[in-house]
Regions:
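Axial heme c-ligation environment in periplasmic c-type cytochrome domains
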Residues: 62-70, 85-126, 161-166, 185-222
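Electrostatic cytochrome c docking/interface patches
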Residues: 35-48, 58-67, 117-144, 165
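The canonical Cys-X-X-Cys-His
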Residues: 49-57, 111, 147-157, 214
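The feature marks the first
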Residues: 43-89, 93
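Extracellular/lumenal glycan-associated surfaces
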Residues: 73-75, 82, 169-172, 178
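C-terminal segment of classical bacterial N-terminal signal peptides
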Residues: 23-38
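Protein kinase-like catalytic domain
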Residues: 55, 87, 138, 154, ...
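N-terminal secretory signal peptides that target proteins for export/translocation
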Residues: 1-19
């Protein structure tokens, strides 16, 4: 099969998955059996291949109608925490719940470690004139709106740390979508509060234009 048709089939698959999110569970044939100890290399390779069908062969993300995040270079602890958040319904996404609840802790650790080592170029596509405004917000915050500098937590280069995510190179439309819909997707299990609560007042205090500016800036970083 040519590379063109392979890419086309993957794109069609992403759209189909997005349309049926929450309606059906993933087929048992693609689930991963619970592993004890270290995840086997062949199991990890198979699951990585499946993940990359949606997140991209270099984990660069998918910049389409249904934006799928960049995982390349992401903090390992953040990836592990978020996969568990899908399982515990602290973060809502029916597609990712169906993926995450099949994974053992060893498999999650192996996947997170692999994604951390990848470093493809940023996807691009953001309106560059907005990046200058976004940089000011990222570095200085918005004192009048009680918004702290993004860099205070995410680091001066937006690389994150521990359970604080890397934003550098993240897809422009994905960042916008997450901030606009923050309270509908994060911190949903009140019995298990998590670090997403820190971002709630920030997401509330930024208007759509400011969110777009920050997204434009971080999407260009390496």
């Amino acid at each position: 099969m040519s590379a063109f048709w392979s890419d086309a089939l993957r794109a069609r698959r992403r759209i189909e998955i997005a349309k049926v999110a929450g309606a059906v569970a993933l087929p048992a044939a693609i689930s991963v059996a619970t592993l004890s100890g270290l995840a086997r290399a062949d199991d990890v390779a198979a699951k990585l291949s499946y993940c990359k069908d949606c997140h991209g062969q270099s984990a660069q993300g998918y910049n389409g109608y249904f934006p799928i995040p960049r995982l390349a270079g992401q903090q390992t602890e953040y990836v592990k925490n978020q996969l568990q958040a899908f399982v515990e319904r602290r973060r809502t996404n029916n597609i990712m719940f169906n993926v995450a609840h099949t994974l053992s802790p060893a498999m999650i650790a192996a996947l997170a470690d692999d994604f951390r080592r990848l470093n493809p170029p940023p996807f691009g596509g953001a309106p560059h004139p907005r990046a200058a405004e976004g940089r000011r917000i990222f570095e200085d915050g918005i004192p009048d709106a009680n918004v702290a500098a993004c860099a205070a937590c995410h680091g001066p280069q937006a690389t994150g740390s521990g359970q604080i995510p890397r934003l550098a190179g993240q897809l422009y439309p994905y960042v916008i979508n997450k901030l606009v819909n923050w309270d509908r997707e994060r911190g949903q299990n009140r019995a298990k509060p998590d670090t997403s609560a820190v971002m709630s007042p920030v997401a509330h205090s930024l208007n759509k234009s400011q969110i777009e500016a920050v997204a434009a800036f971080v999407s260009t970083l390496r």
